[in-house]
Amino acid sequence: MAKAKFERTKPHVNIGTIGHVDHGKTTLTAAITKVLAERGQAEFRGFDQIDNAPEERERGITIATSHVEYETEKRHYAHVDCPGHADYVKNMITGAAQMDGAILVVSAADGPMPQTREHILLARQVGVPYIVVFLNKADMVDDEELLELVELEIRELLSSYDFPGDDIPIIKGSALKGLNGDKDELGEEAILKLMEAVDNYIPEPERAVDKPFLMPVEDVFSISGRGTVATGRVERGIVKVGEEVEIVGIKATAKTTVTGVEMFRKLLDEGRAGDNIGALLRGVKREDIERGQVLAKPGSITPHTKFKAEAYILTKEEGGRHTPFFNGYRPQFYFRTTDVTGVVDLPAGTEMVMPGDNVAVTINLITPIAMDEGLRFAIREGGRTVGAGVVSSIIE
């Protein structure tokens, strides 16, 4: 059979499987491709193909991740699955696999386990906005009341991390049955029900181009007789010639007007998300603007120095530190295009952080940076990456 070409007319959504080790994340991923392949909406990927995930490097961090893609009637999905717990931690913190929603896999036989809790916490910290639950191995639990208790426990756990536990869809089934082609309600039917829940419960993400304009400043130069140009890649939104923008971060926020947009030496009416542009700025001196600041739609982003973050510290093998660090650690934090020094406060009861750990920390920067929740950063020492993090909440 000739491979069906994926139609790109459907909306695209990024999802992934999360949950405790051996609860069936990879089996479920394989089962989804199996069931949808029979409908011509996916290419079947077996357990071993997914489990032997290739290693990728993201910001100098080695992460093993498997990517599969499939379609439902409504959408096209890119789905990530990781073999090891550490890979999930790294993936979620670096944003290597940006998830618009996640399928939390919980074994009905075990109920929520430590990594179930940790993955829910990580999803909350790094801004995975929606979770759908697959209660796996339901065929191994004969007692209906026991199943209901496990479901209740999952809902309470989700609510305790500020997810809407009462509203989240929980689908009971058996990934293994689905993978083995069983057509009953715990097999194929459960997989189709799960995909229907994902279709309906996880909303389509807002496209980058529809968000408020933001461009990190990479370089600045002056053109005699014309003024100052800031160059960079538009991260989100659109900027049109004649629009007012703010210069945010490092110094006091300033307003200016974009009097020209240039790309590949051609003048344009606008710059859009993904474009590498030069923006000509009215009345701005060369020394008024620098790398590390951002151009943004007025009022859309503010500068901050103190925030909470979830961070992953590289192992020695990944090129990270060989020794732990303690409270008051002062590395550089690389945001978008520049390094800023900051001080790390460890949570109460944590004496030190070892290479390979992930930890929730409070960070105080010496210079304000334009930020919002979900912003990713690298932790560096003298230009060498020793960690990665994501802003989970802003303090001031």
UniProtKB/Swiss-Prot annotation:
Keywords: Cytoplasm, Elongation factor, GTP-binding, Hydrolase, Magnesium, Metal-binding, Nucleotide-binding, Protein biosynthesis. Residues 81-84 are annotated as: G3. SUPFAM superfamilies: EF-Tu/eEF-1alpha/eIF2-gamma C-terminal domain, P-loop containing nucleoside triphosphate hydrolases, Translation proteins. Pfam families: GTP_EFTU (PF00009), GTP_EFTU_D2 (PF03144), GTP_EFTU_D3 (PF03143). GTP binds at residues 19-26, 81-85, 136-139. The keyword Transferase does not apply. Residues 60-64 are annotated as: G2. Mg(2+) binds at T26. It comes from the Bacteria. GO terms for cellular component: cytoplasm. GO terms for biological process: translational elongation. It is found in: Cytoplasm. The keyword Nucleus does not apply. One of its GO terms (molecular function) is GTPase activity. Monomer. Belongs to the TRAFAC class translation factor GTPase superfamily. Classic translation factor GTPase family. EF-Tu/EF-1A subfamily. This is Elongation factor Tu. It comes from Geobacter sulfurreducens (strain ATCC 51573 / DSM 12127 / PCA). The gene is tuf1.
